[in-house]
Design a protein with these regions (language model features):
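Intrinsically disordered, low-complexity sequence elements enriched in Ser/Thr/Gly/Pro
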Residues: 1, 15, 97-98
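Bacterial N-terminal signal peptides
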Residues: 8-17
Length: 162
């Protein structure tokens, strides 16, 4: 009987602690890019509605490239990373492309604007409107790109990641 009472008392103590922790979870990524009160920084999720193509495609970095037939995915997106027993030790190692169309709000003019990729696996190139902004050669690591000077205001802009 004593054990049951101890268990109930411990449970009653721990339940409010868990509730407090759950209420303080960040609304955005745990990578540090979440909205902070009174910081002046705005955060916009670009994760939904990327165009995806598995394979080599010439000219896919160009803003006017036709990606209408590509698969639509949300990020993060695993290309084809399967467990060894499911893939026969053969995971896809070729080229892939991701493209995102967006029109920036005029209210953002004059501000510093960055793309923050929480992680890109392996070698990659990031283009905005056909212009190569950075190359990444690491493992599954974050990539941050300043896009302030390459946006076309009031028009369709395209991020392309190879």
């Amino acid at each position: 009987m004593k054990r049951i009472i101890h268990f109930i008392l411990i449970a009653l103590f721990l339940i409010p602690c868990c509730a407090v922790q759950a209420s303080h979870q960040p609304e955005f990524s745990t990578a540090g890019f979440f909205q902070l009160p009174n910081s002046g920084r705005e955060v916009f999720s670009m994760n939904p509605a990327w165009r995806f193509y598995k394979g080599a495609v010439a000219g896919a970095e160009a803003a006017n490239f036709n990606d209408a037939e590509w698969t639509v995915v949300s990020l993060p997106n695993g290309i084809e990373y399967l467990p060894t027993e499911a893939s026969g030790c053969i995971n896809y190692q070729g080229e892939v492309w991701y493209r995102k169309h967006f029109t920036p709000a005029d209210a953002l003019k004059g501000k510093k604007l960055f793309l923050h990729f929480e992680a890109i696996m392996g070698k990659s190139k990031v283009f905005v409107n056909g212009k190569l902004l950075t190359e990444h050669f690491g493992g599954y690591l974050p990539v941050v790109v300043d896009i302030s000077d390459v946006l076309n205001w009031g028009e369709d802009n395209v991020i392309a990641v190879w």
